[in-house]
Curated annotation (Swiss-Prot):
Pfam families: zf-CCHC_6. Residues 1-42, 67-115, 150-295, 326-365 are annotated as: Disordered. The lineage of its organism: Eukaryota, Metazoa, Chordata, Craniata, Vertebrata. This is Putative protein FAM90A2P. Residues 180-198 have a biased composition (Low complexity). The gene is FAM90A2P. It comes from Homo sapiens (Human). It comes from the Eukaryota. InterPro entries: FAM90, Znf-CCHC_6. Residues 74-83, 97-114, 159-170 have a biased composition (Basic and acidic residues). Belongs to the FAM90 family.
Amino acid sequence: MTARRDPKPGAKRLVRAQTLQKQRRAPVGPRAPPPDEEDPRLKCKNCRALGHTVRSTRCPMKCWKAALVPPTLGKKEGKENLKPWKPQVEANPGPLNKDKGEKEERPRQQDPQRKALLHIFSGKPPEKLLPNRKGSTESSVFLRVASRPMPVHTTSKRPCVDPELADRSATEMSGRGSVLASLSPLRKASLRSSSSLGPKERQTGAAADIPQPAVRHQGPEPLLVVKPTHSSREGGCREVPQAASKTHGLLQAVRPQAQDKRPAVTQPGPPAATHSLGLGSNLSFRPGAKRPAQAPIQGCLNFPKKPRLGPFQIPESAIQGGELGALENLQPPPAATELGPSTSPQMGRRTPAQVPGVDRQPPHSRPCLPTAQACTMSHHPAASHDGAQPLRVLFRRLENRRWSSSLLAAPSFHSPEKLGVFLAQSPHVSEKSEGPCVRVPPNVLYEDLQVSSSSEDSDSDLQ
């Protein structure tokens, strides 16, 4: 036990002696305290350091002379710019320096003047100047003149019109003038107040006049009605099943833009009153509807918009088969109370003997049809010798918003009494429907037919 305790105090003494010798040999200056003398639990309040207190002489805040200062690496007297250098201005420059300065100034003054003149006469934008030529640009500011912008030529080119269409429109206008000149003043006034004036074409093998405007207009569309035709003078009728889908081709073939070599007969379309349609005096039209205006027959660049379809449409399968004839465009009447002379062959209910050429006579007054909406068509003057009777188209509305149509052979009546007797004695037409028939006012029938015709016209234009 004693042998183990003895070397410890001796070792401590040796370590202390060695540290004292090192302290004596070390140069005078700050030194770090030995680790055994530092106490980490102490903290100086002045320097916020650990290992000593404020009273300790090792605090750097008390002994500044003992603080560590970085040693200087060398002298820097010649490298620091303590006195800034001033530009040296020569008071008396030599003759060589004067010549060089004049030669440099002359091209600098000529360059901006030349560029300013080029900018005035040529109109080109000036080039970007270098930053070292600021003085020369200031002297040439007075030479710069604001130039006008180049004029913009806006030439409106007129659309090219086909010469054939122009010739056709000229002949049609001349034909209209001759027809108007031959009529009486009363008929002229009625024709001028009509809704449309369109050319009509006489088709070989079909006795029907088909007015067709060149440009479709807004407002109520025309009504499509089937008209019977006769192929011979013996009174024989050609029966062909008719469908609503076939009207597109006929409408496109009859349009005035199509090149047709057959002779064209221009006849005016007079205004149609409510009694001419046979729909009754209670036929009402929309208050916002406008009468269509006649447009010239020329090439149109702006196509009209597709009209909106109403809630009621006549499907193609609802129209029954009948005699295929020419289609007529029946314009809506301009006023319900207008009682003027009607000169339209398709509006009046007449026999072939009552239809002359141009000088037509007003038709007889007709009563309203109570239950069935019927449209009776007259014949063309070419078929006036056959003695055939006109046909009556009967439309009936079903419950599922569908319509059924049928053709009835009706004799010609010259008085309203005979017409009433025939309607009372005529049997009802058998209908191919799925439900019972509902009585509908005439104005609903007219609006539904009008919507269906407008949809068919729009589809044919798109195709």
